Regions:
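Extreme N-terminal tail/first-helix region
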Residues: 1-21
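A generic local structural motif
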Residues: 8-11, 36-37, 117-119
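General secondary-structure edge motif
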Residues: 12, 21, 43-44, 78-81
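A generic structural micro-feature
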Residues: 16, 31-33, 63, 125
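Short beta-strand segments
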Residues: 19-53, 69
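Short, structured beta-strand-loop surface elements
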Residues: 54-139
Length: 140
């Protein structure tokens, strides 16, 4: 993978909202049509994840039906990356990942656009969509 892309994906808790804001294009679960939305991405360990605050989301339903999608970097570096979504369903794994994400969101720099503290980890585990993102070997 190009080093500029690796750097753009290497967010930390100190990363700004714009650094973690991307678009994704999924394939509609019912329509088969492309659906593009804006979303934040997160890191836990060396992995990249997509999630949102607890709620039902159409992007998640789309990825469950069609896990291939496009991950659009758009702030600073612009790149359209073929990607694959794998739902994270194991409660223990979800708790570990959401603990990292909630700690990230509760950083002081996010106070301007997020009510803090965000929902408790258990609320995220019980009600938030969570997918692990991988990129095809062709990007390597």
């Amino acid at each position: 993978m190009d080093q500029k892309i690796v750097d753009a994906l290497a967010i930390t808790p100190a990363s700004s909202a714009s650094e973690r804001t991307i678009d994704i294009t999924t394939t509609g679960a019912k329509t088969g049509s492309p659906r593009r939305i804006e979303i934040w991405f997160y890191r836990s360990g060396e992995q990249i994840y997509l999630t949102t605050q607890p709620a039902s989301r159409s992007w998640y339903a789309n990825l469950l039906a069609n896990p291939a999608f496009t991950f659009h970097l758009k702030n600073g570096l612009r790149a359209d990356l073929p990607a694959w979504a794998e739902p994270v369903l194991d409660p223990i794994e979800r708790r570990r990942i959401f603990s990292d994400i909630v700690a990230d969101l509760n950083q002081p720099l996010h106070r301007g656009y997020l009510s803090q503290p965000v929902e408790p980890v258990e609320d995220w585990v019980a009600g938030s969509p969570l997918v692990r993102v991988s990129f095809p070997e062709s990007l390597s």
